[in-house]
């Protein structure tokens, strides 16, 4: 008989229970950090009009969309990122009190080459502040990003790297009459291509030899923000603003900040500060990234709404947690209720209900199998305790409680089972 073999689509993931434990940890940690900063959660459709991304996302992103014409003849797409949808929501309501601090955790889709930490479908945490053009807003979103990584147990493996689109426009504007974004697109690929390719692409964009040498040198390493005026030969308001952001970040306790000219971010709507959390080991370049985008709302609605935010994908974070051997905490203690002999299921269900009411997770044996098989299963699902209801023990009014980690066990009276487990779980 022919059997249809259907495999998972390339670039997409299945999440088994142990995978979802990691995802839940990432979601919960990011959400708790965001709400500690006063951010509130939003959500939006997974499907948007394609025109939403034609406004200012850039040609490369448009080519990566999962877009199609629906049955109503409309050009739509699975969302490739969250920012345009979030801005659409901001501009759709005039009664919202600003500044708005919003976060979201949608799935996003991009048709790009899968690789470690990069898939065609992933969850992306996003946090944005709308309605403030201050350095304080810039620093706050970076501090939130840093707080999330620290809470995840990744505090020693990253540094914050920042740049400014305005400063880069000042530098590049004097080198070419071409659209600066075409040069930004090349700089964004600096770490993905050889130096020879990088230099050739800059020349093709109309940059002269002196400019090519300067850009290549600027992108070759990180610097302190206090070096900016000397390096650029400028003393602009934007350089002063970047220094102010650094000082504000220090007051948040974020001190691992470096200036990196190669950080420009690939999307065309950024207007000021841009930043990434950089993996110090070099295995993954950008752990998260974002920046200021003050003009996107006006392109959609004509209303000017300054904004700054960042996005963080789950895939790289999950790989970093594994690499750094971060132990995923268990939210609740769990119990597996076993049966030996002819045991009425009602008594097992009664005690499972009592334990659940006290906040424990309880799984009840529903198969007819030996005790060793039950204990093996309890271990496989990560139960902390096994409560063994034995036919003979019940005649004496006791059950056996086994600690699944130490292997120790003891007999406990039926009237003390719940309190005993609660005391052991705390």
Swiss-Prot record:
Subcellular location(s) of the protein: Cytoplasm
An annotated GO cellular component: cytoplasm
Zinc-finger among keywords: no
EC code: 6.1.1.21
Domain of life: Archaea
Keyword terms, alphabetized: Aminoacyl-tRNA synthetase, ATP-binding, Cytoplasm, Ligase, Nucleotide-binding, Protein biosynthesis
Catalytic activity: tRNA(His) + L-histidine + ATP = L-histidyl-tRNA(His) + AMP + diphosphate + H(+)
GO molecular function: ATP binding; histidine-tRNA ligase activity
Main location: cytoplasm
PROSITE patterns, alphabetized: AA_TRNA_LIGASE_II
Top EC class, one word: ligase
Any single Pfam family the record assigns to this protein: tRNA-synt_His
GO biological process: histidyl-tRNA aminoacylation
NCBIfam families named among the record's database cross-references: hisS
Family membership: Belongs to the class-II aminoacyl-tRNA synthetase family.
The protein, known as: Histidine--tRNA ligase
The organism of origin for this protein: Thermoplasma acidophilum (strain ATCC 25905 / DSM 1728 / JCM 9062 / NBRC 15155 / AMRC-C165)
């Amino acid at each position: 008989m022919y059997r249809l073999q259907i495999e998972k689509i390339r670039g997409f993931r299945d999440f088994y229970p142990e995978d979802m434990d990691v995802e839940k940890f990432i979601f919960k940690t990011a959400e708790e950090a965001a709400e500690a900063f006063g951010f509130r959660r939003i959500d939006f459709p997974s499907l948007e009009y394609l025109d939403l991304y034609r406004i200012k996302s850039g040609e490369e992103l448009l080519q990566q969309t999962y877009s199609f014409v629906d049955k109503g003849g409309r050009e739509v797409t699975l969302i490739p990122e969250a920012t345009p949808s979030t801005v659409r929501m901001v501009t759709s309501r005039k009664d919202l009190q600003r500044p708005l601090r919003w976060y979201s955790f949608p799935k996003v889709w991009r048709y790009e080459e899968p690789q470690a930490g990069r898939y065609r479908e992933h969850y992306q945490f996003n946090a944005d502040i709308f309605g403030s053009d201050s350095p304080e807003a810039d620093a706050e979103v970076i501090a939130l990003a840093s707080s999330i990584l620290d809470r995840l147990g990744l505090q020693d493996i990253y540094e914050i790297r920042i740049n400014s689109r305005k400063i880069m426009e000042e530098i590049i504007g004097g080198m070419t009459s071409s659209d600066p974004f075409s040069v930004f697109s090349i700089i964004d690929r600096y770490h993905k291509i050889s130096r020879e390719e990088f230099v050739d692409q800059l020349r093709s964009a109309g940059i002269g030899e002196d400019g090519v040498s300067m850009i290549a040198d600027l992108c070759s390493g990180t610097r302190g923000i206090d070096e900016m005026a000397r390096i650029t030969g400028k003393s602009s308001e934007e350089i002063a603003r970047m220094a102010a952001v650094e000082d504000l970040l220090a007051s948040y306790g974020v001190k691992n900040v470096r200036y990196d000219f190669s950080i420009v971010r690939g999307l065309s709507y950024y207007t000021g500060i841009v930043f990434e959390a950089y993996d110090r080991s070099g295995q993954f370049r950008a752990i998260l990234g974002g920046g200021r985008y003050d003009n996107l709302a006006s392109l959609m609605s004509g209303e000017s709404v300054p904004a700054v935010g960042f996005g963080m994908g789950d895939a790289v974070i999950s790989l970093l947690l594994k690499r750094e051997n971060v132990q995923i905490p268990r939210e609740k203690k769990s119990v597996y209720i076993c049966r030996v002999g002819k045991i009425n299921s009602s008594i097992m269900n009664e005690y499972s209900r009592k334990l659940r009411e006290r906040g424990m997770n309880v799984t009840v044996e529903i198969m007819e199998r030996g005790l060793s098989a039950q204990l093996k299963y309890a271990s496989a699902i990560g139960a902390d305790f096994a409560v063994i209801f034995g036919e003979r023990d019940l005649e004496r009014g006791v059950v056996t409680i086994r600690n699944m980690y130490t292997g120790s066990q003891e007999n406990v009276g039926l009237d003390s089972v719940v309190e005993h487990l609660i005391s052991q779980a705390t």
